[in-house]
Swiss-Prot record:
Record note on quaternary structure: Interacts with INCA1.
Enzyme Commission (EC) number: 3.1.1.97
InterPro entries (UniProt xref): Diphthine_MTase, WD40/YVTN_repeat-like_dom_sf, WD40_repeat_CS, WD40_repeat_dom_sf, WD40_rpt
A GO MF label: protein methylesterase activity
Group of enzyme by EC: hydrolase
Positions annotated as WD repeat: 194-232, 236-276, 422-464
Pathway(s) where this gene product acts: Protein modification; peptidyl-diphthamide biosynthesis
Species annotation: Mus musculus (Mouse)
Taxonomic lineage from the root: Eukaryota, Metazoa, Chordata, Craniata, Vertebrata
Reactions catalysed, as given in the entry: diphthine methyl ester-[translation elongation factor 2] + H2O = diphthine-[translation elongation factor 2] + methanol + H(+)
Keyword set includes Repeat: yes
Pfam family, one: WD40
Protein name as it appears in the record: Diphthine methyltransferase
A GO biological process held by the record: protein histidyl modification to diphthamide
Length: 477
């Protein structure tokens, strides 16, 4: 059990993903918010798959899991309903709105492609994800990230449906999605960074603007109507920028994270100076704003586990970000983390606590594929912004990259299950920035290949749905 003045964190379930897990995403679409997807990445070394001539490249294996959450199954709330083997999954996102009546999941994979899968509802409330379209961006690189332009869950009628993606060559790719057929069309590709472009993300309030972060330590903004020159370049992070998310609740608010072990909060109208800077003692691979509480930010901090951050005073009063909850997982790297869109009314049940000094997670007996690590090469580039101080610990940049980059360990070496009924309250249309008693979240970790389901219990009784008239006294709907 991990606790803080803000509440208690309990682990409800641990699932062995067999391959190393790096991405986890709760479905945001109303009616399907009990579904959870998890993506994995595993490098198969030549000794595991020998080539006759010794020249066959190493294989990046992947698997996509689909789970259904049920509060009634207290022993195992997550039920696996599908698994699909594929190329390694490096990022994935659900589209926040149905497309032609269907729920879509987008994947960025190790074959350099973006793929779309359609959620199919079968008999007995069963679900499967079926491929519907794919677009190869570059066969000689990895697709490292992707984002939908629908992050606010609402959009202006004239706005097209778009995807932005980044790759291991430092390029960005803008794609258009045909809303009738779900076919993908490449609109533009352009060089954005000197080395790996770890992350690309939309400004959800003005989707012509996108942001990117790279292994060259740069955070950049782009206007997709006038490509060629970035709108801004910031080097406030002193190591590779690997996570970015625009706030879906407050215009102009942007969160970024880096291998420098800092989370920065920005007002995009003044990109020279961040609103706040909080050290998190781990490289920040993912950042996720809470779907309801405007000020809560979830950070996957690699070798330092994950943290829940309160950004309210930083945004409203230009004060520091507060770390509400921190959970370390010393035997692995946390790459994936996401908030559930469900408010759930689980009654107190016997749950086992997560001891930070003893992992205590007994997974099924599966052999673990080993990966080796090699730090990428880096460079410096002058920009308009001053450089910030380095991380508080004594690690050099090369040491950190060697320890934090299993996803790219080989980059420089090679040229029908039914879902249970769910008793939940849909909060996707609620507003207000106050805490509520229970939140569900999921994380996935790399070396121990485990997906964790957590319940964060806060001790504060505050108004959740200000002015919406929703009644949280009952969870039935």
């Amino acid at each position: 059990m991990a606790g803080s003045h803000a509440g208690t964190l309990r682990v409800l379930q641990a699932v062995d993903t067999e391959l190393t897990a790096d991405s986890v995403e709760w479905c945001p679409v109303e009616g399907y918010q009990h579904l959870l997807a998890c993506g994995t990445y595993q490098l198969r070394a030549p000794r595991d798959q020998p080539a006759l001539d010794g020249s066959e490249p190493q294989v990046r294996l992947g698997r996509l899991y689909l789970f259904s959450f049920s509060e009634h199954n207290t022993a195992k709330p997550l039920l696996e309903v599908q698994r699909r083997d594929s190329s390694a999954v490096l990022d994935m996102k659900w589209c926040h709105i149905p497309v032609s009546g269907h729920v879509l999941l987008g994947l960025a994979n190790a074959s350099g492609s973006i793929g779309l899968l359609r959620l199919m509802e079968c008999e007995n409330n069963s679900y499967t994800l079926q491929p519907i379209s794919s677009l190869a961006l570059d066969e000689n690189c990895l697709s490292l990230s992707m984002d939908w332009s629908t992050g606010k869950s609402v959009r202006a009628r004239e706005q097209p449906l778009k995807i932005i993606s980044s790759d291991s060559k430092g390029q960005l790719h803008l794609l258009m999605v045909n809303e009738g057929t779900a076919e993908l069309q490449l609109v533009a590709s352009w060089p954005a960074h000197h080395f790996e472009a770890w992350i690309a993300a939309f400004n959800y309030w003005q989707t012509e603007l996108v942001y990117s972060g790279g292994d060259d330590c740069l955070l950049r903004g782009w206007d997709t109507r006038m490509l060629g020159t970035p709108v801004f370049t910031s080097k406030r992070h002193c190591m590779g920028v690997c996570s970015i998310q625009s706030s879906p609740h407050q215009e102009h608010i942007l969160a970024t994270g880096s291998y420098d072990e800092h989370v920065l909060l920005w007002d995009t109208r003044n990109i020279r100076q961040p609103l706040a800077d909080v050290p998190v003692q781990g490289g920040v691979w993912r950042l996720k704003w809470h779907p309801v509480h405007h000020h809560l930010l979830l950070a996957a901090c690699m070798h330092n586990g994950f943290k829940i951050l309160n950004c309210q005073k930083a945004i409203e009063e230009k004060q520091d970000i507060t770390v509400l909850t921190s959970h370390e997982m010393p035997n692995s790297l946390v790459y994936g983390a996401d908030w559930s869109w469900l408010f759930h009314s689980m009654k107190p049940t016997p749950t086992w606590f997560f001891d930070q000094n003893d992992m205590g997670v007994k997974a099924a007996d599966h052999s673990s594929l080993k990966v080796t690590e090699e730090p990428p090469i880096h460079s410096q580039e002058q920009t308009m912004d001053r450089q910030v101080e380095g991380p508080a610990n004594a690690h050099t940049r090369a040491e950190l990259k060697a320890s934090l980059l299993p996803l790219t360990e080989d980059m420089k070496n090679s040229k029908d299950c039914s879902s249970s009924s769910v008793k939940t309250r849909d909060l996707s249309h609620c507003s207000g920035g106050q805490s509520f008693d229970n939140s569900l979240l999921a994380t996935c970790s790399f070396y121990d290949h485990v997906l964790h389901l957590w319940k964060w219990e806060t001790n504060q009784a505050r108004t959740l749905c200000s002015g919406t008239g929703c009644d949280l006294g009952s969870a039935d709907h």
